[in-house]
Amino acid sequence: MTTKMFYDKDIDTTPLENKKIAVIGYGAQGHAQANNLRDSGFDVIMGLRPGKSFDSAKKDGFEVYSAAEATAQADVVMMETPDELQAAVWEKEVEPNLKAGSYLGFSHGFNIVYGLIKPNADINVMIIAPKGPGNIERRQFVEGGGIPSLYGVHQDPTGDTAEVAKAYAKGIGSGRAGILETTFEEETTEDLFGEQAVLCGGLTQLIEAGFNTLVEAGYSPELAYFETSHEMKMIVDLIFEGGFEKMRHDCSNTCEYGEMLNGPRIITEESKQGMRDVLKDIQDGTYAKKWLAEYNSGLKDLEKMRTEYKSGLYEQTGKKVRAMMPWISDADKYSTAADTEQFSAAK
């Protein structure tokens, strides 16, 4: 089935004009969306708790309130707190102050799909999901571009939620790149699967396994890092620009033959079955239950895994290699202050 792509020229922003937008959260997506919307001429306020994000939003010139106060003023409320915090923020601050006929938005459908947030039937519920991290979203917008977004509708009592969602997506710059329709279930399932099986989980395991294979065979960790990790961006850029065809065209014949011959030895039927198992856990809610149980237990397993990865040879080698390339830090100029502080030591 062909999915229609919407661009700036296709979208009327009138449904969003004269509406006050409250963005709840000022992390990567909240920061990017709030700033992009304001630069597009929309009326944006922030709903935040006291802390670094509150101070950062104030410094950036926003009117900042508690989530409850911002919700009470707003026509559109965009939930941009982390997935694991949204249900509590919703229950304590947003739901009691949300007016009938308001528009409740999400950038990820986790809490709706798994039943953690259940808005009343008189609330319009929509999703606007940018397909990229917040700092890239902001950078592209400032430089005159945008990143694609998905939009969808879960509840539509006023009958115009899709138009409001598309106008919002245009406001954050996605109409410059393309806006596609989705559903909450589709976005949530595909997003979680992509992160876990390919983009983050699959890719990091592949990179580290390749790195360790070379090091265990006696090769230099620094050179192993270059071959299995540093060059990854260049290959992905080629795929991003023109698919596998461009990547293969720009690589040598030796590379192309070896890739086609030996790639299937790495991604085997067993690997594919693992992907199907991951997908099933996402679809039936198993992963969501595990993640919420982990969060509610204090993130003990996650913190343990974080510590193990940070102290590993791959990460330590990466720090040495990245120190040779100080220009990499230029990518951080559109990150939030909290992001920059958190990751500066990892350069």
UniProtKB/Swiss-Prot annotation:
Amino-acid biosynthesis among keywords:
yes
Family annotation (NCBIfam families): ilvC, PRK05479.1, PRK13403.1
Similarity comment: Belongs to the ketol-acid reductoisomerase family.
What GO terms fall under cellular component here? cytosol
Task performed by this protein: Involved in the biosynthesis of branched-chain amino acids (BCAA). Catalyzes an alkyl-migration followed by a ketol-acid reduction of (S)-2-acetolactate (S2AL) to yield (R)-2,3-dihydroxy-isovalerate. In the isomerase reaction, S2AL is rearranged via a Mg-dependent methyl migration to produce 3-hydroxy-3-methyl-2-ketobutyrate (HMKB). In the reductase reaction, this 2-ketoacid undergoes a metal-dependent reduction by NADPH to yield (R)-2,3-dihydroxy-isovalerate.
**Gene coding for it:** ilvC
Domain KARI N-terminal Rossmann per the UniProt entry, residue ranges: 3-182
Q: Where is the active site?
A: 108
- Kindly provide the name given to this protein in its UniProt entry: Ketol-acid reductoisomerase (NADP(+))
Q: Which Pfam families match?
A: KARI_C, KARI_N
Q: In which pathway does it act?
A: Amino-acid biosynthesis; L-isoleucine biosynthesis; L-isoleucine from 2-oxobutanoate: step 2/4; Amino-acid biosynthesis; L-valine biosynthesis; L-valine from pyruvate: step 2/4
Protein source organism: Leuconostoc mesenteroides subsp. mesenteroides (strain ATCC 8293 / DSM 20343 / BCRC 11652 / CCM 1803 / JCM 6124 / NCDO 523 / NBRC 100496 / NCIMB 8023 / NCTC 12954 / NRRL B-1118 / 37Y)
Reaction catalysis annotation: (2R)-2,3-dihydroxy-3-methylbutanoate + NADP(+) = (2S)-2-acetolactate + NADPH + H(+); (2R,3R)-2,3-dihydroxy-3-methylpentanoate + NADP(+) = (S)-2-ethyl-2-hydroxy-3-oxobutanoate + NADPH + H(+)
